[in-house]
């Protein structure tokens, strides 16, 4: 087959990535005054449990694939190419033209709506109304209400306040800190915008308080993917736990130590989007936070990189690497998720996993979605090229065995995570009538009948109606059931153990002197991730991470490892910003791969 490296000129350069525009007071415009119902709510434990449950709504909004034209932040981060009528915000982000007039307000509204609701709960808690339920409530649901349950409620409230505030800080920098106040329609509101440092400290303090109450109430650990419903009174799967609070704290402090904000900026005299100076101690603070998580986990074995189990029932399933299964629902073996967003698997739910499959699965494999015409989110060549060879060396490295001579050969012997993340020409996907078959994305001389390994290009090939525009389809998170009428439940994983190891690797590496060898600790964390990814061990179990690698090269390796391991998980956009590498990796058009069959 003849190859052609194609350019997609309509994906505009993203080197101008900026913070979201300034704020509004929409969150204060409350149409209903709920104060009249407080006495009834806080005398009934079932209603209070419902209040706490409600705090979890929209926890995954910034991660959602429904955001910005069905591609979320993956589009401006150059991970996916979007197609649809709702691309304006994604284009503003990609072009660096976000301003007060065109900025989206979901981060602002979601944060302050939840913050206000949590403050109402906290105020009632602090006034003793929640504790009074212990002796007066005749409607205790499920099991007996205890002091530990009430403290569990409070721990969750602290965690979710930190969660929404941390997301807000990523978008805006310093924010107005309303703390525990609850404003009404008649209140005069004059809360100044706090500095970046003050905002980070407040979020970190919320994490510390969350850990205190969650540990104290017996919820230091909660498996992330066992029970999609969860329960305030019973099982706590899918809810906040102490370890999730530690993980969130580590993430917040990683961002706070990064070059975007850990620096002196002449354009930020009020320190709204930076600290105003560089301090290496911020890297140490972030390292200490993530190390606390790792040490606690090492002592208790709560979390691990999902080792995975091969499913050899079909050729397609046996072809998938372990990495693919880290994102599928597995109530027994998946100990990797730390915090998840649980979505319905009902067919009519527009935010569910079925809709996710409809947006990203190839036409030949989505018969039940044939009339939706929603296909979008096509991986870019830039993302595909980031995946190294199976020996761990980059495809442009002289030590690798990368070939660019045939449409299928260029994907052979690559990092196994590639085929778990992206479907390319020659990739296995399950197919209705044949159980499994190769997927074809080529153009040119089409095979229309016969061998199913060759005929899918009629529907899936580049330039076909409603088909890929880059030559690739997304595979990560997608249930590959060949269009069968099944709706398998899958969580959206918001934090997982691999991210913890990547934070530890990055912070440890930044603590050594410039020009020095990368610390052994950083190398070991990356090797752990690559071992699970089924990268070849190579000489002395190095997994492509050599002993003599310097700090600066290790930094680039970690950046690429995050790009690969965390693809489509709402990290790349923020990573590119915090590392200040947008000019290097995002400027210029995106690319795809055109394969012509002759």
Regions found by a protein language model. Give the residues of each.
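Bacterial N-terminal signal peptides that target proteins for export
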Residues: 2-10
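C-terminal motif of bacterial Sec signal peptides marking the signal peptidase cleavage site
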Residues: 20-22
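An aromatic- and glycine-enriched ligand-binding surface/loop that stacks and positions planar moieties
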Residues: 24-89, 175, 200, 239-243, ...
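Conserved, well-structured interaction surfaces
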Residues: 44, 49-53, 57-62, 84-172, ...
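C-terminal substrate/ligand-recognition segments
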Residues: 105, 408-529
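Short coil/turn linking the two alpha-helices of tandem helical-hairpin repeats
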Residues: 169-170, 176, 218, 255-264, ...
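Acidic, serine/threonine/proline-rich low-complexity intrinsically disordered regions
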Residues: 181-182, 193-196, 247, 260-288, ...
